[in-house]
Amino acid sequence: MALDQIQYKAVRHFNGPAMILAGPGSGKTTVITHRVFSLINDRKVPDDEILVITFTKMAAVEMKERYLKMANLRFTPVDFGTFHAVFFMILKNACGFKATDIVKVKDQWDFVKTQFSMYGVDVRDENGVISDIISEIARVKSLPDEKIQEYCPVSCERRLFVSIFREYEHWLETSHMVDFEDMMKKTYCLLRNTPDILNKWQNRYRYVLIDEFQDASPIQFEIVKMLVMPHQNIFIVGDDDQSIYGFRGAAPGVMQEFKKSFPDCAVYTLNTNYRSTGSVVKAATRLINNNKDRFYKDLKAYNDMGEDVVKLIFESTEEEIKYISDLVSDKKPTAVLTRTNSGAVELRRYLLKHGISFNKSDGERDGENIFSHWIAQDINAYFNLARGERVRRDLLRIINKPSRYISRQYFMEKDVDFDLVLLRMKQGNQDRLIKNMNSLMNDLRCISSMPPYAAINYIRKKVGYDAYIYSYCRKEEINSELFMSILDRLQDSSRNFSTLEQWINMVSDGTISDDTRYPLKYSEKSLPDNCTSDSVSNVNICTMHSSKGLEYERVIIIDANEGITPYNKAVSKEEIEEERRLFYVAMTRAKKNLIICSVKRRNNKMLLPSRFVKEI
């Protein structure tokens, strides 16, 4: 890609701080990679003195690959990495930090899920709520101590959130692990209190480039400011209009703070959108101009032609869903964007019932291992119990799969004693439950002596797990063939294992060949996210947050209503402005067509169109 005049000036910037205000589709990645190339080849900067920081591992890999291709190289000493990777590298070098010291995302997920079981929480979109809670925990840990007490969670009721948060911190402490927020604090304290270590890293990286700087938290910025002294060769690229991660501690004000910290910084505004048509850019600009706490940008489209933005109002959610279903049947690459994870549950259900495949999340197949599927986890729980483990979480997973009419009240302890459970049932004269419990115990004894293939078959046929799946699918109005296919593939994958322990170990670490990979991770509490496992769909369903950084030929924003977007818990000026930025991000994902849908009625409740629709 040839550079335009402003891009060229930014790329040629040499020493001293620089801020690149990069509007949507303005070629920010191109600017970063070309500047790295220019520093090395034109300015003769040693390549191992350059650090490029991104916010995701995928972005770091993509940027490095683009640089290597542009420079016609197979390897480079330039460091491309996330904040996470940089902080880990500093702590590893100074304190002997190990990867095993960092809590895994899966372990965080499992911990919160266990807390749900302990507190008897039952929500429909369990995966979405767990994800939100983990994000909010990170948000709270990034706040100053004086603000933590007044924090009001949006993921769940405050008392539950406080309980989970306290248990989470205790769990990390007793497990001798840290999360990303702990790593940031440790890195900050290390560099602030150890001048010789700070000096070492200041000399190591004399040129620092940061992508998506608007997403940086205050503590990340403080660390960066220490690292770039005294040379101040810091080159940030960001767009305060796309700052949408307030729940993680980011704020658009970090761009303003950069200007205050480096008052003599050069400012380059990339104001040409090479992605979207003129109609999309103009509509999005009208929207975002309603925000006051921002850098002004005179945005324009490289392609000023294009179809008008379409705004539709439907009588009901059902009518909206029917319209979308008919529209996406033309197989045109499309993204359906929602405000929350649960926002598209009914749409997914409808598409599933009508045989329309779709992808969830980042616009691509998720690539999740089939053994992450909740069905595989159910089988795993049966195997754990058959091997003599008595973890409450495993028992609660399968106690009513199939239904045994046994309440969780009989399993109060973390490690379950079957004899104690039977005693409680006897004290309550629950003969039917005693019979069902004895039947389960007998089934577990039988399974314990079987190889995995036979054990899975026994669980499916003798225990009645297949019957449970059929019943579940009838209740949810879902085609059972997909779930039966998962069970068949799980069972087939177990042929080469002789013991339950071998199979469990394989499930735990995912060491399995690619032919048993499955495209999606389903939540039992939510709906399956794709109705086929073979075809690659042109229909992508994801939240506005997860659409950031992506682009689509056609974008459909659904449920653009007050109380949904802006979210009903967004009250303050700052919160409303962040909601508007989120809507702006959603709009600017569209390359050619943008359709914005509102409904008059949802779940028998009357709704108003979003104020954002009126501002466009």
Task: Describe each PLM feature range.
Residues R601-I616:
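Helicase C-terminal subdomain and adjacent C-terminal extension
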Residues I20, P24-I32, V36, P263-A266, ...:
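Helicase P-loop NTPase motor core
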Residues F14, F75-P77, C95-E181, Y205:
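ATP-hydrolysis module of ASCE/P-loop NTPase motor domains
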Residues M425-S546, Y567, I595, V613:
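Accessory C-terminal helicase-associated subdomains
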Residues A2-R12, G16-L21, L51, D79, ...:
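Conserved helicase NTPase motor core
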Residues D330-P452:
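ATPase/helicase motor core of nucleic-acid motors
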Residues D79-M89, L209-E212, V237, T340, ...:
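Conserved helicase core region in the C-terminal RecA-like lobe
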